[in-house]
Protein backbone atom coordinates (compact mmCIF):
# COMPACT_ATOMS: atom_id res chain seq x y z
CA UNK A 1 0.00 0.00 0.00
CA UNK A 2 0.84 3.67 -0.08
CA UNK A 3 0.81 5.98 2.91
CA UNK A 4 1.25 9.69 3.43
CA UNK A 5 1.93 10.89 6.97
CA UNK A 6 1.56 14.61 7.58
CA UNK A 7 1.09 17.03 10.45
CA UNK A 8 -1.46 19.80 9.98
CA UNK A 9 -2.50 22.28 12.67
CA UNK A 10 -0.79 20.20 15.33
CA UNK A 11 -2.54 16.97 14.32
CA UNK A 12 -0.96 13.82 12.89
CA UNK A 13 -2.76 12.61 9.77
CA UNK A 14 -2.45 9.29 7.93
CA UNK A 15 -3.56 9.61 4.31
CA UNK A 16 -5.34 12.80 5.32
CA UNK A 17 -7.30 11.18 8.17
CA UNK A 18 -6.90 11.82 11.89
CA UNK A 19 -5.65 8.75 13.74
CA UNK A 20 -4.63 7.62 17.22
CA UNK A 21 -2.05 4.89 17.80
CA UNK A 22 -3.27 2.21 20.23
CA UNK A 23 0.00 0.44 20.71
CA UNK A 24 2.50 -1.73 22.52
CA UNK A 25 6.27 -1.84 22.87
CA UNK A 26 7.65 -5.07 21.45
CA UNK A 27 11.01 -6.77 22.01
CA UNK A 28 12.14 -9.81 20.05
CA UNK A 29 11.83 -12.77 22.43
CA UNK A 30 11.47 -16.54 22.23
CA UNK A 31 11.18 -18.50 25.46
CA UNK A 32 13.30 -21.34 24.02
CA UNK A 33 15.74 -19.43 21.80
CA UNK A 34 16.06 -16.04 23.45
CA UNK A 35 16.69 -13.32 20.88
CA UNK A 36 16.76 -15.81 17.98
CA UNK A 37 13.14 -15.38 16.93
CA UNK A 38 11.70 -17.11 13.87
CA UNK A 39 9.18 -15.37 11.65
CA UNK A 40 6.35 -17.74 12.56
CA UNK A 41 6.58 -16.46 16.12
CA UNK A 42 6.79 -12.85 14.93
CA UNK A 43 3.67 -13.39 12.83
CA UNK A 44 1.86 -14.82 15.85
CA UNK A 45 2.81 -11.74 17.89
CA UNK A 46 1.41 -9.38 15.27
CA UNK A 47 -1.79 -11.37 14.78
CA UNK A 48 -2.37 -11.42 18.54
CA UNK A 49 -2.01 -7.65 18.58
CA UNK A 50 -4.64 -7.24 15.88
CA UNK A 51 -6.94 -9.71 17.63
CA UNK A 52 -6.75 -7.51 20.73
CA UNK A 53 -7.59 -4.20 18.99
CA UNK A 54 -3.97 -2.99 18.95
CA UNK A 55 -3.20 -0.94 15.85
CA UNK A 56 0.41 0.14 16.43
CA UNK A 57 3.74 -1.27 17.60
CA UNK A 58 6.98 0.40 18.66
CA UNK A 59 10.10 -1.56 17.75
CA UNK A 60 11.70 -1.05 21.13
CA UNK A 61 14.56 -0.38 20.91
CA UNK A 62 16.11 -1.43 17.61
CA UNK A 63 15.23 -2.16 13.97
CA UNK A 64 13.53 -5.49 13.35
CA UNK A 65 13.94 -8.12 10.66
CA UNK A 66 12.79 -6.58 7.33
CA UNK A 67 10.06 -9.24 7.15
CA UNK A 68 8.51 -7.78 10.31
CA UNK A 69 7.68 -4.56 8.44
CA UNK A 70 6.32 -6.56 5.48
CA UNK A 71 3.92 -8.32 7.84
CA UNK A 72 2.83 -5.01 9.38
CA UNK A 73 2.17 -3.67 5.86
CA UNK A 74 0.05 -6.73 5.14
CA UNK A 75 -2.14 -6.88 8.24
CA UNK A 76 -2.39 -3.15 8.93
CA UNK A 77 -0.26 -2.28 11.94
CA UNK A 78 1.23 1.19 12.25
CA UNK A 79 4.89 1.15 13.25
CA UNK A 80 6.90 3.54 15.40
CA UNK A 81 10.21 2.49 13.86
CA UNK A 82 13.02 2.93 16.36
CA UNK A 83 16.75 2.87 15.75
CA UNK A 84 19.23 1.00 17.93
CA UNK A 85 20.42 3.74 20.24
CA UNK A 86 20.40 3.74 24.04
CA UNK A 87 22.97 5.17 26.45
CA UNK A 88 20.98 4.43 29.59
CA UNK A 89 24.03 3.00 31.35
CA UNK A 90 25.68 6.41 31.54
CA UNK A 91 23.09 7.31 34.18
CA UNK A 92 25.30 5.28 36.53
CA UNK A 93 27.97 7.98 36.25
CA UNK A 94 25.48 10.84 36.27
CA UNK A 95 25.69 11.81 32.59
CA UNK A 96 23.27 9.96 30.32
CA UNK A 97 24.11 12.32 27.43
CA UNK A 98 27.90 11.85 27.72
CA UNK A 99 28.36 10.58 24.17
CA UNK A 100 25.08 12.01 22.84
CA UNK A 101 26.60 15.50 23.12
CA UNK A 102 30.13 14.47 22.09
CA UNK A 103 31.01 15.39 18.46
CA UNK A 104 33.39 12.44 18.24
CA UNK A 105 30.34 10.16 18.30
CA UNK A 106 28.31 11.98 15.65
CA UNK A 107 29.25 9.63 12.76
CA UNK A 108 28.16 6.60 14.80
CA UNK A 109 24.82 8.22 15.65
CA UNK A 110 24.24 9.21 12.02
CA UNK A 111 25.08 5.68 10.90
CA UNK A 112 22.38 4.24 13.16
CA UNK A 113 19.56 6.35 11.75
CA UNK A 114 20.76 5.97 8.16
CA UNK A 115 20.70 2.19 8.35
CA UNK A 116 17.16 2.18 9.73
CA UNK A 117 15.64 4.68 7.31
CA UNK A 118 17.35 3.39 4.18
CA UNK A 119 16.26 -0.16 4.98
CA UNK A 120 12.63 0.54 5.91
CA UNK A 121 11.53 3.76 4.20
CA UNK A 122 9.57 1.94 1.48
CA UNK A 123 7.19 0.38 4.01
CA UNK A 124 3.76 1.99 4.28
CA UNK A 125 3.40 0.76 7.87
CA UNK A 126 6.06 3.18 9.16
CA UNK A 127 4.21 6.17 10.59
CA UNK A 128 6.96 7.63 12.79
CA UNK A 129 10.73 7.32 12.95
CA UNK A 130 12.27 7.19 16.43
CA UNK A 131 15.85 8.34 17.03
CA UNK A 132 16.34 5.93 19.91
CA UNK A 133 15.57 5.52 23.58
CA UNK A 134 16.81 7.03 26.85
CA UNK A 135 20.03 8.56 25.55
CA UNK A 136 19.71 12.10 26.82
CA UNK A 137 19.70 15.05 24.44
CA UNK A 138 22.48 16.82 22.61
CA UNK A 139 24.14 17.71 19.34
CA UNK A 140 24.13 14.16 17.96
CA UNK A 141 20.35 13.87 18.34
CA UNK A 142 20.00 17.10 16.37
CA UNK A 143 22.30 15.68 13.70
CA UNK A 144 20.30 12.43 13.56
CA UNK A 145 17.08 14.36 13.11
CA UNK A 146 18.52 16.40 10.26
CA UNK A 147 19.83 13.33 8.45
CA UNK A 148 16.55 11.46 8.98
CA UNK A 149 14.57 14.29 7.37
CA UNK A 150 16.99 14.35 4.43
CA UNK A 151 16.27 10.69 3.78
CA UNK A 152 12.49 10.59 4.37
CA UNK A 153 9.78 13.19 5.09
CA UNK A 154 7.84 11.23 7.72
CA UNK A 155 7.60 12.69 11.25
CA UNK A 156 10.31 11.99 13.81
CA UNK A 157 9.93 11.00 17.48
CA UNK A 158 12.41 11.02 20.35
CA UNK A 159 11.16 11.07 23.93
CA UNK A 160 14.16 12.81 25.51
CA UNK A 161 13.83 15.88 23.31
CA UNK A 162 11.64 17.11 26.14
CA UNK A 163 11.08 20.59 24.70
CA UNK A 164 10.44 19.27 21.17
CA UNK A 165 13.32 21.40 19.92
CA UNK A 166 13.68 19.36 16.75
CA UNK A 167 11.29 16.37 16.81
CA UNK A 168 7.92 16.53 15.08
CA UNK A 169 5.97 14.59 17.74
CA UNK A 170 6.42 15.34 21.44
CA UNK A 171 6.51 12.36 23.77
CA UNK A 172 6.66 11.34 27.41
CA UNK A 173 6.78 8.02 29.23
CA UNK A 174 4.95 6.94 32.40
CA UNK A 175 3.12 10.25 32.78
CA UNK A 176 0.29 10.01 35.31
CA UNK A 177 -3.34 10.21 34.21
CA UNK A 178 -3.59 13.69 35.72
CA UNK A 179 -0.50 14.80 33.79
CA UNK A 180 -1.94 13.49 30.54
CA UNK A 181 -5.12 15.44 31.20
CA UNK A 182 -3.04 18.57 31.82
CA UNK A 183 -1.23 17.96 28.53
CA UNK A 184 -4.60 17.76 26.81
CA UNK A 185 -5.96 20.89 28.47
CA UNK A 186 -2.82 22.82 27.52
CA UNK A 187 -1.76 21.23 24.23
CA UNK A 188 1.67 21.60 22.68
CA UNK A 189 1.88 22.93 19.16
CA UNK A 190 3.00 19.46 18.07
CA UNK A 191 1.08 16.18 18.39
CA UNK A 192 1.76 14.18 21.54
CA UNK A 193 2.13 10.47 22.30
CA UNK A 194 2.81 8.42 25.43
CA UNK A 195 5.59 6.12 24.24
CA UNK A 196 5.62 3.94 27.38
CA UNK A 197 2.97 3.48 30.09
CA UNK A 198 0.96 0.85 31.93
CA UNK A 199 4.04 -1.16 32.93
CA UNK A 200 2.53 -4.65 32.72
CA UNK A 201 4.43 -6.26 35.58
CA UNK A 202 3.07 -8.42 38.38
CA UNK A 203 -0.71 -8.47 38.46
CA UNK A 204 -0.84 -6.51 35.22
CA UNK A 205 -1.06 -2.96 33.91
CA UNK A 206 -2.98 -0.49 36.05
CA UNK A 207 -5.36 2.32 35.23
CA UNK A 208 -5.82 1.46 31.55
CA UNK A 209 -9.44 2.60 31.45
CA UNK A 210 -8.61 5.84 33.25
CA UNK A 211 -5.78 6.55 30.81
CA UNK A 212 -7.97 5.74 27.83
CA UNK A 213 -10.71 8.14 28.88
CA UNK A 214 -8.18 10.97 28.98
CA UNK A 215 -6.44 9.97 25.75
CA UNK A 216 -9.78 9.75 23.94
CA UNK A 217 -10.86 13.11 25.34
CA UNK A 218 -8.07 15.15 23.75
CA UNK A 219 -7.33 15.29 20.02
CA UNK A 220 -3.79 16.50 20.69
CA UNK A 221 -2.90 13.14 22.32
CA UNK A 222 -2.49 10.76 19.41
CA UNK A 223 -1.22 7.53 20.78
CA UNK A 224 -0.01 5.34 23.60
CA UNK A 225 2.21 2.28 23.86
CA UNK A 226 1.97 -0.14 26.79
CA UNK A 227 5.25 -1.40 28.22
CA UNK A 228 5.54 -4.14 27.14
CA UNK A 229 4.32 -6.92 24.87
CA UNK A 230 5.90 -10.15 26.18
CA UNK A 231 7.34 -11.56 29.40
CA UNK A 232 11.05 -12.34 28.86
CA UNK A 233 11.03 -15.69 30.62
CA UNK A 234 13.24 -18.54 29.41
CA UNK A 235 12.00 -22.12 29.39
CA UNK A 236 13.74 -24.67 31.62
CA UNK A 237 13.00 -28.26 32.64
CA UNK A 238 12.54 -29.32 36.26
CA UNK A 239 13.88 -32.60 37.63
CA UNK A 240 10.43 -34.17 37.28
CA UNK A 241 10.33 -33.22 33.58
CA UNK A 242 7.93 -30.29 33.91
CA UNK A 243 8.68 -27.13 31.95
CA UNK A 244 8.87 -23.87 33.85
CA UNK A 245 10.13 -20.38 33.04
CA UNK A 246 13.11 -18.60 34.53
CA UNK A 247 14.30 -15.02 34.90
CA UNK A 248 17.30 -13.09 36.22
CA UNK A 249 19.31 -15.01 38.82
CA UNK A 250 17.79 -18.41 38.09
CA UNK A 251 20.90 -19.47 36.16
CA UNK A 252 23.47 -18.25 38.67
CA UNK A 253 23.92 -15.03 36.71
CA UNK A 254 25.02 -11.96 38.66
CA UNK A 255 24.35 -9.09 38.53
CA UNK A 256 20.82 -9.56 37.29
CA UNK A 257 17.50 -7.74 37.09
CA UNK A 258 15.54 -10.46 38.88
CA UNK A 259 11.94 -10.52 37.59
CA UNK A 260 12.03 -7.03 36.08
CA UNK A 261 11.65 -8.41 32.55
CA UNK A 262 8.53 -10.37 33.47
CA UNK A 263 6.40 -7.40 32.52
CA UNK A 264 4.42 -8.30 29.41
CA UNK A 265 0.86 -8.50 28.16
CA UNK A 266 1.53 -12.02 26.93
CA UNK A 267 3.25 -14.84 28.80
CA UNK A 268 6.63 -16.12 27.58
CA UNK A 269 4.94 -18.82 25.46
CA UNK A 270 2.65 -16.24 23.77
CA UNK A 271 -0.45 -16.93 25.86
CA UNK A 272 -2.48 -13.74 26.44
CA UNK A 273 -2.56 -12.56 30.05
CA UNK A 274 -5.59 -11.03 31.81
CA UNK A 275 -3.86 -7.68 31.27
CA UNK A 276 -4.09 -8.12 27.51
CA UNK A 277 -7.78 -8.98 27.79
CA UNK A 278 -8.30 -5.74 29.70
CA UNK A 279 -6.34 -3.73 27.12
CA UNK A 280 -8.44 -5.27 24.33
CA UNK A 281 -11.65 -4.16 26.02
CA UNK A 282 -10.31 -0.67 26.70
CA UNK A 283 -9.46 -0.38 22.99
CA UNK A 284 -12.75 -1.80 21.67
CA UNK A 285 -13.34 0.22 18.48
CA UNK A 286 -17.13 0.18 18.81
CA UNK A 287 -18.31 1.71 22.08
CA UNK A 288 -21.67 0.66 23.54
CA UNK A 289 -23.75 2.12 26.37
CA UNK A 290 -27.24 1.02 27.45
CA UNK A 291 -29.80 3.11 29.32
CA UNK A 292 -33.59 3.02 29.62
CA UNK A 293 -34.07 0.52 26.82
CA UNK A 294 -31.76 2.31 24.39
CA UNK A 295 -28.35 1.24 23.11
CA UNK A 296 -25.98 4.10 22.37
CA UNK A 297 -23.38 2.96 19.83
CA UNK A 298 -20.33 4.91 18.62
CA UNK A 299 -17.90 3.97 15.86
CA UNK A 300 -14.44 4.68 17.27
CA UNK A 301 -12.59 3.48 14.19
CA UNK A 302 -10.54 5.92 12.16
CA UNK A 303 -10.88 4.60 8.61
CA UNK A 304 -13.75 2.10 8.30
CA UNK A 305 -17.48 2.06 8.92
CA UNK A 306 -19.49 -0.47 10.94
CA UNK A 307 -21.12 -2.32 8.05
CA UNK A 308 -19.19 -5.42 9.19
CA UNK A 309 -20.30 -5.17 12.84
CA UNK A 310 -23.10 -6.98 14.62
CA UNK A 311 -24.19 -6.76 18.26
CA UNK A 312 -24.89 -10.11 19.91
CA UNK A 313 -27.33 -9.36 22.76
CA UNK A 314 -27.92 -11.68 25.70
CA UNK A 315 -30.31 -11.36 28.61
CA UNK A 316 -28.68 -12.95 31.64
CA UNK A 317 -30.84 -13.83 34.65
CA UNK A 318 -29.04 -14.77 37.87
CA UNK A 319 -25.98 -15.63 35.82
CA UNK A 320 -27.77 -17.79 33.24
CA UNK A 321 -28.30 -16.64 29.64
CA UNK A 322 -31.97 -17.15 28.78
CA UNK A 323 -32.39 -15.25 25.50
CA UNK A 324 -30.21 -14.12 22.60
CA UNK A 325 -30.79 -11.76 19.69
CA UNK A 326 -28.71 -10.01 17.05
CA UNK A 327 -28.79 -6.30 16.30
CA UNK A 328 -26.94 -4.49 13.53
CA UNK A 329 -25.85 -0.92 14.31
CA UNK A 330 -26.00 0.05 10.64
CA UNK A 331 -23.31 1.79 8.63
CA UNK A 332 -21.75 4.31 10.99
CA UNK A 333 -18.83 6.25 9.55
CA UNK A 334 -15.81 6.90 11.81
CA UNK A 335 -16.83 8.99 14.80
CA UNK A 336 -20.58 8.66 14.13
CA UNK A 337 -23.01 7.69 16.90
CA UNK A 338 -26.49 6.23 16.86
CA UNK A 339 -29.20 5.20 19.32
CA UNK A 340 -31.00 1.87 18.89
CA UNK A 341 -34.11 0.61 20.70
CA UNK A 342 -33.23 -2.36 22.88
CA UNK A 343 -35.93 -3.11 25.44
CA UNK A 344 -34.90 -5.73 27.99
CA UNK A 345 -37.51 -7.12 30.36
CA UNK A 346 -36.38 -7.49 33.95
CA UNK A 347 -36.96 -10.95 35.43
CA UNK A 348 -39.10 -10.91 38.56
CA UNK A 349 -37.23 -11.63 41.77
CA UNK A 350 -33.88 -11.94 40.00
CA UNK A 351 -30.74 -10.07 38.98
CA UNK A 352 -30.99 -9.24 35.27
CA UNK A 353 -28.09 -8.20 33.05
CA UNK A 354 -27.79 -7.24 29.40
CA UNK A 355 -24.57 -8.52 27.81
CA UNK A 356 -23.53 -7.07 24.44
CA UNK A 357 -20.87 -8.86 22.39
CA UNK A 358 -19.48 -6.69 19.58
CA UNK A 359 -18.51 -8.99 16.69
CA UNK A 360 -17.12 -8.67 13.18
CA UNK A 361 -19.07 -10.45 10.45
CA UNK A 362 -16.10 -10.71 8.07
CA UNK A 363 -12.93 -12.79 8.14
CA UNK A 364 -9.55 -11.07 7.86
CA UNK A 365 -5.91 -12.08 7.49
CA UNK A 366 -5.69 -12.31 11.29
CA UNK A 367 -9.20 -13.14 12.54
CA UNK A 368 -12.05 -15.52 11.68
CA UNK A 369 -15.59 -14.45 10.89
CA UNK A 370 -17.46 -13.66 14.11
CA UNK A 371 -14.35 -12.45 15.93
CA UNK A 372 -15.27 -10.59 19.13
CA UNK A 373 -14.07 -6.98 19.24
CA UNK A 374 -15.30 -6.37 22.78
CA UNK A 375 -18.02 -7.13 25.30
CA UNK A 376 -20.13 -4.89 27.53
CA UNK A 377 -22.49 -5.80 30.38
CA UNK A 378 -25.14 -3.64 32.02
CA UNK A 379 -27.40 -4.16 35.04
CA UNK A 380 -31.02 -4.04 33.89
CA UNK A 381 -32.59 -4.61 37.31
CA UNK A 382 -31.76 -6.19 40.64
CA UNK A 383 -34.90 -7.66 42.17
CA UNK A 384 -33.07 -10.50 43.88
CA UNK A 385 -33.64 -9.13 47.36
CA UNK A 386 -31.26 -8.27 50.21
CA UNK A 387 -30.25 -11.89 50.89
CA UNK A 388 -29.12 -12.64 47.33
Model-inferred region functions:
Residues 1, 6, 296, 328-331, ...:
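Generic structural detector for well-ordered beta-strands
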Residues 1-296, 300-307, 312-320:
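Extended substrate-binding grooves/exosites of carbohydrate-active enzymes
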Residues 1-2, 16, 363-387:
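Short beta-strand elements
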Residues 129, 345-348, 384-387:
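Polar low-complexity intrinsically disordered regions
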Residues 278, 282, 312, 348, ...:
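Extended interaction regions within the primary functional domain
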Residues 292, 322, 384-387:
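Flexible inter-domain linker/hinge segments
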Residues 301, 355, 360, 383-388:
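Beta-strand-rich N-terminal accessory domains
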Residues 309-311, 316-351, 355-368:
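Intrinsically disordered, low-complexity Pro/Gly/Ser/Thr-rich segments with frequent PxxP/GP/PP motifs
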